[in-house]
Amino acid sequence: MAIIKGFKNYEINRDGTVINLKNGKELIPYRHRGYSKIKLTNDKGKRIAWRINRLVYEAHLGTIPKGYEIDHIDGDRSNNNLDNLRMVTRQQNIKLKSFRRK
């Protein structure tokens, strides 16, 4: 488990499970354009929607630099396990997506 930066009341597992630390409950993600997303309240009290793949990556491996995206290695946008995620450039991600469609 790792605390989500900027969201001290939440932890996230390597598999993408998000826990609310105030009540101990698991948050249920929703799907948007094939991606698993979750709404969290940040440390300033603002509610924000995030892709779970980005939260998993950043909580366990660090900040994603500008211009980079998180790719699902197996192409399954619902598989947010850390072992299935890698950082790629936007151009690399576009090539990977077009390759997977063939």
Residue spans for each PLM region:
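Conserved recognition-core residues within compact binding domains
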Residues: M1-E69, D74-K102
